[in-house]
Amino acid sequence: ERLMAEGARHYGTLRGRALQWLERVEIDAGRIDDKPALYSGGMQQRLQIARNLVTSPRLVFMDEPTGGLDVSVQARLLDLLRHLVLDMDLAVILVTHDLAVARLLSHRLMVMYRGEVVETGLTDQVLDDPHHAYTQLLVSSILQG
């Protein structure tokens, strides 16, 4: 749908782009005609990533992109996301409660508490030397957990 919204109408072109993106997100091209409901959770996430990136946006919003996935699936998906972000030079706004995901995917971090921004800065600086009490609690609870 997204390619058609941008004016693509030729079936061969649409299918070709879809095949390219299935390959980029590591889904077997032979499954191009499968309904999304037939995919596993991790494959559905990768399919959604392809759907959102097919039009080459400059900015992407991700809300808990690895939520609900097994740890092994999360690792593969995070690796894929990291490579796509670098390859496409994407700006990403990422919402996550997982500090490992934040550390892996972000350059800058904003910590919110009760709807207010309490700390911002380079990811490593904020996580390695938190100044706000909530950020300190957040980081220490992850280290102890």
Where are these regions (language model features)?
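Conserved ABC ATPase "signature" region
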Residues: 13-30, 139-140
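Conserved catalytic motifs of ABC-family nucleotide-binding domains
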Residues: 56
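Helical segment within the ABC ATPase nucleotide-binding domain
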Residues: 75-88, 100
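C-terminal boundary and immediately downstream tail of ABC-type ATPase nucleotide-binding domains
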Residues: 26, 127-145
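A short, surface-exposed alpha-helical micro-motif characterized by mixed small hydrophobic
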Residues: 102-104
